[in-house]
A protein has these predicted regions:
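Alpha/beta-hydrolase active-site loop signature
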Residues: 45, 69-73, 113, 137, ...
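Conserved acidic catalytic loop of the alpha/beta-hydrolase fold
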Residues: 87-104
């Protein structure tokens, strides 16, 4: 039996869709529609529901918008298999335009963190605050191997519980109940009664799990808004040295580390994640 942290409650949310020239994007919202928007971007193989606990914690202060990025959750799959940062960027441009996000805060995890970094290059003037979660311009090989290890397992199993068992073995930091809740939003049942992932199988290919070459360091140097860099204490994804360099390159940034957390920081230790990230976001929001 694992000593997992307590799980916060989840509030109900609303569902919406944005039509882009390439895919249909599904998003979830919490909070007052008139409040400052807070956009949340998940990692590879995840869904908008990844953020449910954190979104619940933020709904009294923001209009929270969590997106199923292309190829994930209930959003459309890329017709040409394009899951590059540029493709994600086009989708997010459409989301920002159609939801009329004149000014917003942005939080991105892993793949979503890198997509968030690229987004600052085009929408920096709109950003109130930025949170980059366990993602950096350079990805250690250990991270890619770990992610691919989980995604490269069997993609069809007899039951949801079979997926839960596999997830428990892969990430013992989280309770069976929280893993099941997360998986239920990330699985679909096949006509023969078996279960498989919602995400596009193309994403299981290692070559599709990387963003295209580009100098993210130069992008970081131009970020004008206050930035919080969050890393998991037990995660290989964002080494202390790289996080420290990011904080030096970004003009107004600092680093926080979440204890008892691997790569999926906000799910492994949601209480501490909220305690360290919420004040950073709310401070600017209440300042007007």
């Amino acid at each position: 039996m694992t000593n997992t942290p307590p799980t916060p409650p989840i509030a109900p949310c609303q569902e919406g869709f944005v039509e882009t020239p390439e895919v249909r994007l599904r998003y979830l919202t919490w909070g007052d529609p008139g409040a400052t928007p807070l956009v949340l971007l998940h990692g590879i193989g995840q869904t908008a529901h990844t953020w449910a606990y954190f979104a619940t914690a933020m709904q009294d202060h923001f209009r929270v918008v969590a997106v199923d990025q292309r190829g994930h959750g209930d959003s459309g799959w890329a017709p040409d298999g394009d899951y590059s940062a540029a493709a994600h960027g086009r989708d997010l441009d459409a989301l920002i335009l159609q939801l009329r996000l004149e000014e917003f805060a942005l939080v991105g995890f892993s793949m979503g963190g890198r997509n968030a970094m690229w987004l600052t290059d085009r929408h920096g003037a709109r950003l109130r605050r930025l949170v980059i979660v366990d993602a950096g311009p350079q990805r250690p090989h250990a991270t890619g191997s770990s992610a691919r290890q989980f995604m490269s397992g069997p993609d069809v199993l007899d039951s949801v519980e079979d997926f839960v068992e596999r997830a428990v073995r892969f990430n013992p930091r989280r309770s069976r109940e929280t893993l099941r809740e997360s998986l239920l939003h990330n699985l679909r049942q096949l006509p023969d009664g078996k279960w498989t992932w919602k995400y596009d199988p193309v994403l299981r290919q290692p070559s599709r799990q990387t963003t295209p070459a580009g100098d993210l360091w130069s992008v970081l140097a131009k970020i004008a808004c206050a930035t919080l860099i969050v890393r998991g204490a037990e995660s290989p994804a964002l080494p202390e040295e790289q996080a420290a360099r990011m904080a030096e390159v970004i003009p107004n940034a600092r680093v926080v580390t979440i204890s008892a957390a691997g790569h999926t920081v906000m799910g492994d230790n949601p209480i501490e994640f909220e305690a360290k990230v919420k004040p950073f976001l709310v401070e600017k929001n209440t300042a007007g």
